A protein has these predicted regions:
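Bacterial Sec-dependent N-terminal signal peptides
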Residues: 1-24
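Short, catalytically relevant binding-site loops at active-site mouths
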Residues: 144, 180-183, 210
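Short, solvent-exposed aromatic-acidic interface loops
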Residues: 250-257
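Acidic-and-aromatic substrate-binding clefts and catalytic sites of carbohydrate-active enzymes
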Residues: 45-51, 76-83, 108-112, 181-185, ...
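Extended active-site neighborhood of metal-dependent phosphoesterases/phosphodiesterases
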Residues: 82-161, 165-172, 190-202, 214-247
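N-terminal active-site segment of His-dependent metallophosphoesterases
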Residues: 19-86
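Active-site glycine-centered loops adjacent to acidic/histidine catalytic or metal-binding residues
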Residues: 41, 74-75, 104-105, 178, ...
């Protein structure tokens, strides 16, 4: 499937998707028009301002009537301990619309209980969510050993394969993981093999804390900024809109005044 990532700058990305015959593919063949917020690398409990940045983001998203749901793509805590997950749960309860949550390496492999507590509190480390005919599929990630290379656990691979097998061939899919699908991910080829069995239109990732486009072996990929403010006065996140045949990414800097 031929796909083009048409534009990239600090504040906007645009994804144009075409079928093999040069005509718009199924993601653009319908009059879909919706938006979602995308947060990643929240790192709750890393800096004194991390909690405030997340709370401000939740309030900002709630105040935007155009946002239909929110995706959080991993490293939502710094050390993955129970108190961090409990605080995260309390903050995320503030969302007035659905949110989809994935763990990253900081959430599941940097503590003794991360692997079990994330699933216990948030019920699952993956999601499959349909919105206006588009399927959003996300699976958990983390190194197989503490401080090891990026890796998607075997149980998540098996789950991903089962979800893709059950997905209609023509249905557009957007895949989400904490790690970019590149050579740094130890089992990247296995993941890409699964993604290419269906109509995967784009892949979203975090981990690197920057807005950037990349080529995931022929599938358009986008890496998102961290919600942390760092040197800015306040944090931010990305707003993603599917409008016709274009998937648009806009950086949102939270306004507090």
């Amino acid at each position: 499937m031929k796909k083009f990532l048409s534009a990239l700058c600090m504040t906007a990305l645009s994804l144009l998707v075409y079928g093999q015959d040069g005509h718009p593919s199924s993601i653009s063949g319908n009059r879909r028009n919706f938006s979602f917020a995308w947060l990643t690398d929240v790192h709750l409990n890393s800096f004194a301002y991390a909690e405030d940045d997340l709370r401000q983001a939740v309030e900002d998203i709630n105040a935007n009537p155009d946002v239909d749901f929110t995706i959080l793509s991993g490293d939502v805590t710094e050390f993955g301990d129970t108190k961090e997950f409990q605080l995260l749960e309390e903050i995320l309860k503030g969302f007035r619309k659905p949110y989809l949550l994935l763990p990253g390496n900081h959430d599941v492999n940097w503590s003794e209980n991360g692997c079990t507590m994330f699933d216990k509190i948030f019920r699952a480390s993956h999601f499959c969510y349909d919105w206006q005919g588009v399927r959003f599929v996300g699976c958990g990630a983390g190194p197989s050993l503490r401080m090891g290379p990026p890796h998607i656990p075997r149980e998540e691979i098996l789950w991903l394969d089962s979800v893709y097998n059950a997905t209609p061939a023509a249905q557009p899919v957007i895949f989400v993981n904490h790690f970019p699908l590149n050579a740094d991910l130890s089992n990247c080829r296995e993941v890409l093999r699964i993604l290419k069995t269906r109509n995967t239109q784009a892949v979203l990732a975090g981990h690197l804390h920057v807005n950037r486009s990349y080529d995931a072996d022929g599938i358009p990929g986008v890496i998102g900024r961290s919600s942390l403010r760092r040197k800015d006065p306040i944090g931010g996140y990305n707003l993603v809109t599917l409008r016709g045949n274009t998937l648009e990414f806009h950086e949102r800097i939270i306004k507090t005044e």
